[in-house]
Amino acid sequence: VLAAAASTLKRVTLELGGNDAGIVMDDVDVEAVAPQIFDGAFGNNGQICIAMKRVYAHESIYDKLVDQLAELAKEAAVGNGLEQGTKLGPLQNKMQFDKVKGYIEEGRADGTIVAGGEVPDGKGYFIPPTIVKDIDDESRLVKEEQFGPVLPVIKYDDIDDVIERANDTDYGLGGSVWSSDTDRAYEVAKKVDSGTIWVNKHADVQPHIPFGGIKTSGIGAELGEEGLAEFTARKVINVAKA
């Protein structure tokens, strides 16, 4: 789209992919935030540009958070969205279905799968929500955008180090910071290189708030006054004084 627009200098806005990191600090109430983190990662079975693609959890709450996320994953019914009780539907197409299965195998090789990981037999591109622990930043599952129901949970012990790790990506669409101390979380959020950083929530997009990515996650903004301004051009009328 950008290349096609270049020849005639058309202005464009681009909202592209992301590898959103969730940074979970050491003072969180794990039982309170785990369902929100799960929903932030697995909404539409992970097929949302601003879904949480990787979680960094402080070592002091790491095991508890992994256990909570694993339980939520095991409880989430996957199937036909028209059927009562279904929480998560299928992958959108076979290409993405096969791609996500590949990421599951990456997770199996590089970490430990604690929930999901097995693709059911039968028709449909159904993959259960999969939680992977004991994995590091060099795995493809962490470095790339999986766009599907596979969530790596990575351990950290130093906040400055994890900010650097979260920023070590070509993407910059969204991200979130989770803490019982919002002032502390805000200071962390200021250092994360993304177009939007949520505190104690994720993927909360509102029509009056501008949204857009940085780095390879996009150009310009949509929504809000800034989004409307993308479709306007500044005009100056300069009149000589008598």
PLM features: residue spans?
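ALDH superfamily catalytic-core signature
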Residues: 1-136, 199
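Conserved C-terminal structural/oligomerization subdomain of aldehyde/semialdehyde dehydrogenase
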Residues: 23, 77-78, 104, 119, ...
